[in-house]
């Protein structure tokens, strides 16, 4: 689940020239397995309300209580399975970090891993009711991702004493970011040297994938979560620092995403709803 102001994967936002991020906001929800749904309605400025602790986008909202992130979801899923997606998500961090990572030297892209270790309770339609590991972060940017990056991967893996997060990004100028971060359950964070990158099977759309893995071990996909021509999200098993773990892995090919041919395809999955009234 992601709240966007300036929906970076919206074709409508790109077609607008990205002049007004507040006019392209959304609450993106993806559920997996039987009955899985995907919501990413691009909404206009009229649907956006912000306060220091609450983000409201049309009929849905995210609220920070000081100790929990509570998300009230009221969306319609995208084709081919068009139906209401409603319910509540409660994320409780075990600790909050003070980490802020500059992904590009000019400060145009920032990653803020608020709570890589958290508990989550999900109660949504289509029978998606569960609790388990949660994760809470944010990205901030003043430039388009595809303008500054060629490719990146990200992974978050539970380990015995917290979580290990890895960012590997290749910028368009050829420079590279290789970041490892260990976050303890109480939010204490420290930089770590990532194990060597190891390739594993490409996605259904043949997006290249790799993730850190101890020498002599090989990562593998446990479950595909989201596949697009330029993007893969999956549960991946790897071994890091002697621990076998299953976490969430993402791969984003921004060379593919730059193609204007993708935009009409995305418009089917990302409908535009510019009007809204809170009255």
Curated annotation (Swiss-Prot):
Keywords: Carotenoid biosynthesis, Chlorophyll biosynthesis, Lyase, Photosynthesis
GO biological process: carotenoid metabolic process; chlorophyll biosynthetic process; photosynthesis; spheroidene biosynthetic process
Gene Ontology MF term list: hydro-lyase activity
Lyase as UniProt keyword: yes
Source taxon at top rank: Bacteria
Pathway: Carotenoid biosynthesis; spheroidene biosynthesis
Catalytic activity, as annotated: rhodopin = all-trans-lycopene + H2O; 1-hydroxy-all-trans-1,2-dihydro-neurosporene = all-trans-neurosporene + H2O
EC number: 4.2.1.131
Family: Belongs to the CrtC hydratase family.
Function: Involved in the biosynthesis of carotenoids spheroidene and spirilloxanthin. Catalyzes the hydration of neurosporene to the corresponding hydroxylated carotenoids 1-HO-neurosporene and that of lycopene to 1-HO-lycopene.
Protein's recorded name: Acyclic carotenoid 1,2-hydratase
Gene that specifies this protein: crtC
């Amino acid at each position: 689940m992601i709240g966007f102001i300036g929906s970076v994967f919206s074709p409508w936002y790109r077609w607008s020239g990205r002049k007004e991020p507040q006019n392209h906001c959304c609450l993106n929800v993806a559920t997996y397995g039987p009955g899985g749904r995907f919501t990413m309605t691009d909404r206009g400025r009229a649907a956006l309300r912000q306060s220091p602790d609450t983000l409201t986008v049309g009929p849905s909202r995210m609220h920070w209580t000081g100790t929990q992130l509570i998300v009230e979801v009221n969306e319609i899923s995208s084709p081919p399975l068009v139906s209401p997606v409603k319910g509540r998500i409660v994320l409780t961090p075990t600790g909050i970090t003070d980490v802020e990572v500059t992904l590009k030297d000019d400060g145009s892209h920032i990653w803020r891993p608020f709570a890589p270790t958290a508990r989550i309770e999900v109660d949504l339609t289509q029978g998606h009711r569960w609790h388990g590991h949660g994760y809470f972060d944010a990205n901030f940017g003043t430039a388009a991702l595809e303008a500054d990056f060629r490719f990146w991967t990200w992974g978050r893996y539970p380990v015995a004493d917290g979580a290990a997060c890895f960012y590997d990004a290749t910028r368009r100028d050829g420079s590279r970011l290789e970041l490892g971060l260990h976050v303890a359950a109480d939010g204490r964070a420290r930089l770590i040297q990532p194990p060597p990158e190891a390739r594993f099977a490409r996605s259904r759309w043949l997006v290249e994938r790799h993730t850190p893995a101890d020498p002599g071990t090989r990562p593998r996909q446990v479950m595909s979560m989201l596949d697009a021509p330029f993007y893969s999200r999956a549960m991946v098993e790897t071994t890091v620092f002697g621990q076998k773990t299953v976490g969430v892995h993402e791969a984003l090919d921004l060379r593919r995403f730059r193609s204007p041919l993708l935009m009409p395809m995305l418009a089917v999955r990302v409908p535009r709803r510019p009007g809204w009234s809170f009255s």
